[in-house]
């Protein structure tokens, strides 16, 4: 498996050399012209950077931009709201947490208190490390994750600073593992 190409290799504009592409990427808010991921940029900021590059006349060399794949993002140009809402293929994030004494409103309040920027789609506006810290806060608050433990960020690489080598009681924190293909 080949590593992904550097970010600057995915953009082109007539008369602009590689250094010009790198400078434009940094000018459009990308933290690096080579490689970015969820630990360095949010989904919305990535989409905003792509829109900036397109606005400067650069052409994206891959098949689809981030907004093509994620039209619901606030940074993406206005689209048909129904189509954008239909592009989500999973329930809102607040449905991923439960506690016997907490209704949906209390879950959402706890999520906000734990630092979630959104109770619907936190990945749009939060870095992975911040989501991991919020997940740990929810577990500390006695909430159970309704997805398998493997979906917790502190159970998957990359090692995030927020995880602090914490051991999570996977037998009690989360829903049981699912068989392949099971929803």
Regions found by a protein language model. Name each.
Residues 1-183:
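Mitochondrial intermembrane space
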């Amino acid at each position: 498996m080949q590593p992904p190409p550097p970010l600057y290799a995915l953009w082109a504009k007539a008369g602009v050399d590689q250094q010009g592409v790198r400078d434009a990427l940094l000018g459009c808010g990308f933290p690096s012209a080579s490689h970015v991921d969820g630990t360095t940029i949010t989904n919305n900021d990535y989409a905003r950077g792509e829109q900036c590059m397109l606005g400067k006349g650069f052409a994206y060399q891959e098949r689809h931009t981030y907004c093509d794949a994620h039209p619901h993002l606030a940074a993406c140009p206005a689209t048909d709201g129904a189509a954008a809402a239909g592009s989500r293929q999973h329930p809102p994030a607040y449905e991923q947490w439960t506690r016997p004494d907490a209704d949906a409103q209390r879950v959402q309040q706890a999520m906000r208190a734990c630092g979630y920027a959104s109770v619907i789609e936190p990945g749009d506006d939060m870095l992975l490390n911040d989501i991991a810290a919020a997940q740990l806060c929810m577990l500390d608050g006695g909430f159970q994750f309704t997805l398998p433990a493997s979906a917790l960020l502190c159970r998957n690489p990359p090692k995030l600073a927020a995880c602090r080598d914490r051991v999570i009681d996977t037998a009690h924190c989360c829903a049981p593992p699912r068989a392949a293909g099971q929803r």
